A protein has these predicted regions:
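Short connector loops at helix/strand junctions that flank enzyme active sites
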Residues: 33-35, 55-59, 65-67, 88, ...
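Short, conserved beta-strand element in jelly-roll/cupin
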Residues: 58-70, 76, 85-93, 135-137
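Conserved metal-binding segment of the jelly-roll/cupin
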Residues: 104-119
Length: 139
């Protein structure tokens, strides 16, 4: 996927660079309507056994941990073999039961991007995390 030519992705990166995300209130913040928005959330973290891989068709995720480091399970979508239900077009999400992923840890101050070709299992860790989840329309 050519992210360099996705104007919404470039807008998101600029917003991340220019904004203190920790100052944003929890909730959905529209940056360019449904083309680009960010959800600021507090979420309970999960064990690797509890975490589920997810994929999206319409949106690229940029996930930014704000309060603590966060680990993610990551696997190419084409290699996922065990869907957990049907694709939910309204929520733009499909889960997988696969557990044979690579674990990546993202530190506070870093961001990670997941395009529609990459399955990801977020929120791996202990306690509660404050984070930003950018939803970037696939151009």
């Amino acid at each position: 996927m050519d992210l360099d030519n996705n104007k919404y992705y470039q807008q998101a990166l600029q917003y991340i660079a220019d904004t203190d995300l920790s100052e944003l209130e929890n909730g959905k913040h529209l940056l360019d309507g449904d083309n680009l928005f960010v959800n600021i959330v507090d979420s309970d973290m999960k064990t690797p056994e509890q975490a589920r891989l997810e994929v999206h068709d319409k949106y690229i995720d940029i996930q930014v941990p704000l309060s603590k480091d966060e680990s993610f399970g990551v696997k190419p979508r084409k290699d996922c073999v065990e869907p957990d239900g049907e694709f939910n077009t309204e929520k733009d999400i499909l889960f997988y039961k696969d557990k044979d992923w690579t674990t990546v840890t993202v530190e506070v101050g870093q961001a990670i991007t997941f395009d529609p070709d990459t399955a990801h299992a977020p929120l791996i860790g202990e306690g509660t995390i404050h984070k930003a989840i950018f939803k970037v329309k696939v151009a």
